[in-house]
Curated annotation (Swiss-Prot):
UniProt: CoA binding residues: R191, A192, G193, R194, T311, N335, S523, R584
GO biological process, one term: acetyl-CoA biosynthetic process from acetate
Function, in words: Catalyzes the conversion of acetate into acetyl-CoA (AcCoA), an essential intermediate at the junction of anabolic and catabolic pathways. Acs undergoes a two-step reaction. In the first half reaction, Acs combines acetate with ATP to form acetyl-adenylate (AcAMP) intermediate. In the second half reaction, it can then transfer the acetyl group from AcAMP to the sulfhydryl group of CoA, forming the product AcCoA.
GO cellular component annotations of the record: cytosol
Family: Belongs to the ATP-dependent AMP-binding enzyme family.
Co-factor requirement: Mg(2+)
Sequence positions bearing N6-acetyllysine: K609
UniProt catalytic activity: acetate + ATP + CoA = acetyl-CoA + AMP + diphosphate
Gene: acs
Pfam families: ACAS_N, AMP-binding, AMP-binding_C
Entry protein name: Acetyl-coenzyme A synthetase
Species of provenance: Escherichia coli O157:H7
GO molecular function: acetate-CoA ligase activity; AMP binding; ATP binding; metal ion binding
The protein's Enzyme Commission number: 6.2.1.1
Length: 652
């Protein structure tokens, strides 16, 4: 694999890069051998109210998983992202907002963003929100989403951002689990010319009898669309901030005070509230942003991720703003109203650094040269990829067509739980191979292990674990530390298990091969198979369901659901549509099955366990080696499934 064509470091990058190959080696070695010294120094990327004396205090030991960084230091995230830039760079653009409609865009300076955040912080205080309270944010991609998040951090409230594509049921579940006191939303969102009924979804979520903690709903007027209104509970954003002062002293927070909860799909069905704290998280987000994107003051940076995902937290907002960068926030989609929209936005705003997902890249690649028609993209210097492994063909297309064969592609591997980049190239320090995330970031100690947890040396393939802590690591799952230990530290003792498999080549470059557990990666978004199965079996006509992922050209993985109906029920085109809509309503459009495979029975072991390995192979059409079927209670089921599969039209 090391024989694959290597992309060398372009001269224009090498000439002014922040980290060259020699510096990377020296800094990486220090970060591993002397983490207290290394991170003690790197922590100075932030302004601290009370400087830390302690740096690292962590344990991955069974029954005693505990992660603390900079634990005696105090700071405020919003002050680091806003206040400290005002004197020198108050007039610099903090956020460029590009609307779904290309005629709508605006520039918001650091001074203006600071003013808006102070006003909203005072609004939150007036509504009785205190340090430690949880605030749910269900917003479109508008600057006010950033204002809401930063205002929470400013007063010490914990934000729980919920992706605007989630259904009312999913929203309710997250509000209940986190005990949110306030919901911030918008009348509607806008995406690819369509309105998204955000306020209606919140109304429906709050009808759930188990939602008892919410006192108010603050509503931003985005479209002016007609919405229901509950007097006393619902409040207009503009009415509230109008009366609020633009002066606010940021709350002094301990480095280990909670900053946000972000729900991510688990393999057991119930979404997990990943909890990040303030100090270590922001040090890590800022440092990774600066070095991985080789950020120079004045660069225009665009991360296409929604604020509802961790990428939107770390690399649309907090990392860039902590570094005083100009970050572009895009309400629309990369290929609407024309396939060249992404390239047009790059030219319009003279973007230097572009960070997007393989799903978007593959969708544009399918359009060929229409994706770059009428654009030159000459402002670009660095390209990035996030969300799932990028296949070499898409990587090469991205490098060649979007980046004009001159921009390094930083293919970043990380997770909601890691807070920031883990395995990634550095533009001036790493020769690139299409499809490889390359080498670990500072302080990250990856290892590949076999099923027993034994480390594998040299060029090999195995489960990807991290053997020691890093500052951006999630501290726990909200309200469930036992599940945190069980999920990430019980498979392999004294190691963090990522749930991903990987290959390491002769150059010690890492190639991520995908999930090894029951989590799907659809368009760069994680979905638990158990969550989708629970939604399916909740349908009154469905007896049983098993969900697997199959390869998909655009989305990376498509959702393939095996469904057995209750006795007396018959499959029909109407039921097919009804079941797909049912899942869409229960979880959201992302979770809609691409294929429903009606069947009478599923392959089970004698103990009743569904053999997913076999279902994956059948769904993917890989029937050459189904492996050991001797433990099946009824081996004949497999033949029947193979026959049924012949008649199924597969998504392209």
């Amino acid at each position: 694999m090391s024989q694959i064509h290597k992309h060398t470091i372009p001269a224009n990058i090498a000439d002014r890069c922040l980290i060259n190959p020699q510096q990377y080696e020296a800094m990486y070695q220090q970060s591993i051998n002397a983490p207290d010294t290394f991170w003690g120094e790197q922590g100075k990327i932030l302004d601290w109210i009370k400087p830390y004396q302690k740096v690292k205090n962590t344990s991955f030991a069974p029954g005693n998983v505990s992660i603390k960084w900079y634990e005696d230091g105090t700071l405020n995230l919003a002050a680091n992202c806003l206040d400290r830039h005002l004197q020198e760079n108050g007039d610099r653009t903090a956020i460029i907002w590009e609307g779904d409609d290309a005629s709508q865009s605006k520039h918001i300076s650091y001074k203006e963003l600071h003013r808006d955040v102070c006003r909203f912080a005072n609004t939150l205080l007036k509504l009785g929100i205190k340090k430690g309270d949880v605030v749910a944010i269900y917003m479109p991609m508008v600057p006010e989403a950033a204002v809401a998040m930063l205002a929470c951090a400013r007063i010490g409230a914990v934000h729980s951002v919920i992706f605007g594509g989630f259904s009312p049921e999913a929203v309710a579940g997250r509000i209940i689990d986190s005990n949110s006191r306030l919901v911030i939303t918008s009348d509607e969102g806008v995406r690819a010319g369509r309105s998204i009924p955000l306020k209606k979804n919140v109304d429906d979520a709050l009808k759930n009898p188990n939602v008892t903690s919410v006192e108010h709903v603050v509503v931003l007027k985005r479209t002016g669309g007609k919405i229901d209104w509950q007097e006393g509970r619902d409040l207009w954003w503009h009415d509230q901030v109008e009366q609020a002062s633009d002066q606010h002293q940021a709350e002094e927070m301990n480095a280990e005070d909670p900053l946000f909860i972000l729900y991510t799909s688990g393999s057991t069905g119930k979404p997990k509230g990943v909890l990040h704290t303030t100090g270590g998280y922001l040090v890590y987000a800022a440092l990774t942003f600066k070095y991985v994107f080789d950020y120079h003051p004045g660069d225009i940076y665009w991360c296409t991720a929604d604020v509802g995902w961790v990428t939107g937290h770390s690399y649309l907002l907090y990392g860039p703003l902590a570094c005083g960068a100009t970050t572009l926030m895009f309400e629309g989609v990369p290929n609407w109203p024309t396939p060249a929209r992404m390239a047009q936005v790059v030219d319009k705003h003279q973007v230097n650094i572009l960070y997007t997902a393989p799903t978007a890249i593959r969708a544009l690649m399918a359009e060929g040269d229409k994706a770059i028609e009428g654009t030159d993209r000459s402002s670009l210097r660095i390209l990035g990829s996030v969300g799932e492994p990028i296949n070499p063909e898409a990587w090469e297309w991205y490098w060649k067509k979007i980046g004009n064969e001159k921009c390094p592609v930083v293919d970043t591997w990380w997770q909601t739980e890691t807070g920031g980049f883990m395995i990634t190239p550095l533009p001036g320090a790493t020769e690139l191979k299409a499809g490889s995330a390359t080498r670990p970031f500072f302080g990250v100690q990856p290892a590949l292990v076999d099923n027993e947890g034994n480390p594998l040396e040299g060029a090999t393939e195995g489960s990807l674990v991290i053997t020691d802590s890093w500052p951006g690591q999630a501290r726990t799952l909200f309200g469930d530390h036992e599940r945190f230990e069980q999920t990430y530290f019980s498979t392999f003792k004294n190691m963090y298990f990522s749930g991903d498999g990987a290959r390491r080549d002769e150059d010690s470059y890492y190639w991520i091969t995908g999930r090894v557990d029951d989590v799907l990666n659809v368009s760069g978004h994680r979905l638990g198979t158990a969550e989708i199965e629970s939604a399916l079996v909740a349908h009154p006509k469905i007896a049983e369901a098993a969900v697997v992922g199959i390869p998909h050209n655009i989305k990376g993985q498509a959702i393939y659901a095996y469904v057995t109906l209750n006795h007396g029920e018959e499959p029909s085109p109407e039921l097919y549509a009804e079941v797909r809509n049912w899942v869409r309503k229960e979880i959201g459009p992302l979770a809609t099955p691409d294929v429903l495979h009606w069947t009478d029975s599923l392959p089970k072991t004698r103990s009743g366990k569904i053999m997913r390995r076999i279902l994956r192979k059948i769904a993917a059409g890989d029937t050459s080696n189904l492996g050991d079927t001797s433990t099946l209670a009824d081996p004949g089921v497999v033949e029947k499934l193979l026959e049924e599969k012949q008649a199924i039209a597969m998504p392209s």
